[in-house]
A protein has these predicted regions:
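Active-site beta-loop-alpha junctions of metal-dependent nucleic acid enzymes
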Residues: 1-11
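Short A/G/S/P-biased low-complexity tracts
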Residues: 136-138
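Loop/turn elements at helix/coil->beta-strand transitions in domains of secreted/extracellular proteins
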Residues: 12-13, 39-41
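Charged alpha-helix within mobile-element recombinases
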Residues: 30-34, 40-130, 140-143
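Glycine-centered flexibility motif
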Residues: 6, 22-23, 55, 71
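Acidic/histidine-rich, metal-coordinating catalytic segments
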Residues: 11-27, 47-49
């Protein structure tokens, strides 16, 4: 994200990261500080077995599990490159949410921070404007 958004925009948009204590976050200090020593963000960890402390991000995990069921072979479903990751992200972030009055995360981002949305579009992520075309199933990667 730091590379996609650029340092200034990243610092403005990602002041903190709240996560669990998964093994992927064992080097949190490297995520918090750039190689030049400047502060990138601050990471905070939820208590063990307290996923409710992460708020609505758990709902995103549920959507991700619709596409990538736990224990599935990610390569077998087509998750082999950045393009595949983008397809998953586009579908999850284009999914309308009741909590957002039927809007998607992409639509909210466009409204709250057009410069950030523009950077994601430049990276290759796009909103799926017709919600009927959003696919939250493993075969979404086979349709590319």
């Amino acid at each position: 994200l730091d590379e996609i958004l650029g340092h200034d925009l990243f610092n403005r948009e990602v002041e903190v990261i709240k996560t669990d204590r998964g093994s992927e976050f064992t080097c949190a200090d490297q995520a918090e500080v750039r190689s030049d020593g400047t502060r990138r963000t601050r990471m905070f960890f939820c208590d063990p077995m307290a996923s409710w402390q992460k708020g609505s991000i758990e709902n995103v995990h549920l959507l991700l599990r619709e596409i990538c069921p736990k224990g599935c072979d990610l390569k077998a479903i087509g998750l082999i490159d950045q393009h595949a990751c983008n397809i998953i992200s586009e579908n999850i972030n284009s999914y309308p949410k009741e909590k957002l009055n039927g809007k998607s995360s992409f639509q909210l981002l466009e409204f709250l921070s057009h410069p950030t949305a523009k950077k994601f579009y430049e990276f290759g992520l796009h909103n799926i404007s017709n919600s009927d075309e959003v696919i939250l199933k493993p075969y979404v990667l086979k349709k590319r």
